[in-house]
Amino acid sequence: MSWFITFEGPEGAGKTTQCALLAARLREAGYSLLVTREPGGTPLGETIREWLLAGEALRPETEALLFTAARAEHVWDRIRPALERGTIVLCDRYVDSTLAYQGAGRGLDEGWLRELHRIATGDLWPDLTILLDVPVEVGLARRRAAAATITRLDQEELAFHRRVRAWYHAAAQRDPQRWRVVDATLPPEVVADAVWATVTEVMKRGRRSP
């Protein structure tokens, strides 16, 4: 049984933490897992990640193309093979981050970004996307308080981050079958319980990856 589950949300929402907590529960339940992230997941992806998050500012088009190049390697080398083996794939960010950040945030055409995704991945979309929602100011304050490595995206103006969050809300409303919204302002253990309840409910319903 293969499932492709992604975590999305603004900065400081706790995606990496919740992805790890869900992975632990699924492993305890006996499932085979691939836990990965974007950008990253492959040697090329990790190299691109380091450049994109810490390097000099790039044109929005260049940024989007680099994210998509990393995703192409990631999908064809790791994600698709795992799904074909019947593995559950958990991914910390995926194409929706590109649509939110480079599309809504940077102002690139969403149709163009979707076409890039289609070409790069064979149009592979998640079965379930968990949106960990947190107000922009709260998320950025969490990042600062945790002394996390500050990336170029963290340093964007508040208006940029608000556009990103608004895109996520709109996407979840447009496709409620794929998206589930979880209040990420709650304590991590409460969020983890909500994520677990969501995943088990969706898996019980029977939507699977192609």
From Swiss-Prot:
Entry keyword set: ATP-binding, Kinase, Nucleotide biosynthesis, Nucleotide-binding, Transferase
Name the chemical reaction catalysed here: dTMP + ATP = dTDP + ADP
Pfam families in the cross-refs: Thymidylate_kin
Gene3D superfamilies hit by this protein: P-loop containing nucleotide triphosphate hydrolases (3.40.50.300)
Q: Which InterPro entries match?
A: P-loop_NTPase, Thymidylate_kin-like_dom, Thymidylate_kin_CS, Thymidylate_kinase
EC number annotated for this UniProt entry: 2.7.4.9
- Does the record bear Transport in its keywords? no
Q: Name one GO cellular component term.
A: cytosol
Name the Gene Ontology molecular function terms of this record: ATP binding; dTMP kinase activity
Biological-process GO terms, alphabetical: dTDP biosynthetic process; dTTP biosynthetic process; dUDP biosynthetic process
Q: Where does ATP bind?
A: 9-16
Q: What's the stated role of this polypeptide?
A: Phosphorylation of dTMP to form dTDP in both de novo and salvage pathways of dTTP synthesis.
Family, similarity comment: Belongs to the thymidylate kinase family.
Q: What is this protein called?
A: Thymidylate kinase
Tell me which species this is from. Answer: Thermomicrobium roseum (strain ATCC 27502 / DSM 5159 / P-2)
High-level lineage: Bacteria, Pseudomonadati, Thermomicrobiota, Thermomicrobia, Thermomicrobiales
Q: Which gene encodes it?
A: tmk
